[in-house]
Structures are given as C-alpha cells and as structure tokens.
Amino acid sequence: MRLGRDMLAPAARLASSRCLGSLARATARKAARSGPDRLLTSRRRFIIDSRRWGRPKTGPNPTDRARPGSKHHIVTDANGTPLAAILTGANVNDVTQLLPLIDAIPPIRGLRGHPLQRPRVVYADRGYDSERHRRALRDRGIEPVIAKRRTEHGSGLGKYRWVVERTHAWLHHFRRLRIRFERRADIHGAFLKLGCCLICWNTLRRADQSL
C-alpha cells in the first residue's frame, strides 16, 4: 500500500467532519459483504504499539530530555488496519494507554448472529508489560500476549508485531504526522485520526479492486 506523503494537506478541511470510528464501521460493513476473507476475520487478533514525535501534546522526550515530544499510540487488526489512535506526551508510559485503546475500538458488525466487538487476543511489546493490565484484559475475555521486560529478543512476538510497525510507517508517510507542525494537541490529534481514516479508505479501495 502506498500513500501520498502530502495527502493530509488538501484533506485537512475534512478533519472536523470525519472520524476513525464511523469510517471503521463503514469499512467493516463493506468488507463483510465482500466475503469472509476480508477485514472482519482479522478482528480476532489486535496489535498495539506507539511512536514518539516532537512538539506538544507534550512531556519531556525520554530519548532527548532537552526537547518536548508527543507519542502516537495505535491499535490495529491483524491486517494492519488502524482501529483506534491516541495522542499523548512522549513521557507517558505505554501501558497507561493499553485499556483506553481497547475501549476506543469502535463497535462494528461481526458475523451474522455473532457480533464481535472485542478482540480475542491482543499482542503488545515490553512497554505494555503489566500483570494488572493482563488481568484486566482477561476479565474482559481478551487473552493478552505481551512480552516481558527481561525476555530476550526473538521470542516470536515479532511475527505479529511487524503489522503495527508497518501501520506506523504508513502513518508517517504523511508529512504532518512525520513532522509535527501544530502546537495544539487537538489539531495534531485530528490529523492522526484523519491519517488512520485514509489508511482505512485505501485498504477498502484496494480490496474492491481485487474483487
């Protein structure tokens, strides 16, 4: 999937009238009509990750204490389709956004008679390692697959996490997300969600072309 780097600039006026939730629901409904091998089959496995970038919504950047920064937290399905995105300061611990990301996933129609609103499995890296949050996910009927902090690399989680890494790369093809120009967090957060909407739209467009 290739996304134009400057698509957000002409689309900026849409930020006030578009949101990730409504487009994700429409995408899933269209995919459900396209066949069983489309987006809905991937809602059983979700992957969570975050990336740090400059300017506020801000806290000290952990990688450069002299500069403020912000962080993009996203959750995707197993195909890399973004389902929810949250903007925080760069010094916010990843694990604090685990449950808010799960709660932000928009409800969409599942298979007939078996609506699926929550994932069955969530994959995440060491930044989300917390027994309290594992218990909270299990209480919701979600199986957490989260790397522990002291485990070596190569544990096998990477075969799932590369999907969300790719989605971060797609988002940062957009210059306004790769380089933060906005001082106001709400404006940058709107661009983040608009970027997710464009990825959803591009995914659906390519799925239609393959039919």
Swiss-Prot record:
UniProtKB keywords: DNA recombination, DNA-binding, Transposable element, Transposition
Disordered, as annotated region: 51-71
GO biological process, one term: DNA transposition
GO molecular function: DNA binding; transposase activity
Protein purpose: Involved in the transposition of the insertion sequence.
NCBIfam families named in the record: transpos_IS5_3
Record family assignment: Belongs to the transposase 11 family.
Protein name as it appears in the record: Putative transposase for insertion sequence element IS402
Native species: Burkholderia cepacia (Pseudomonas cepacia)
Lineage: Bacteria, Pseudomonadati, Pseudomonadota, Betaproteobacteria, Burkholderiales
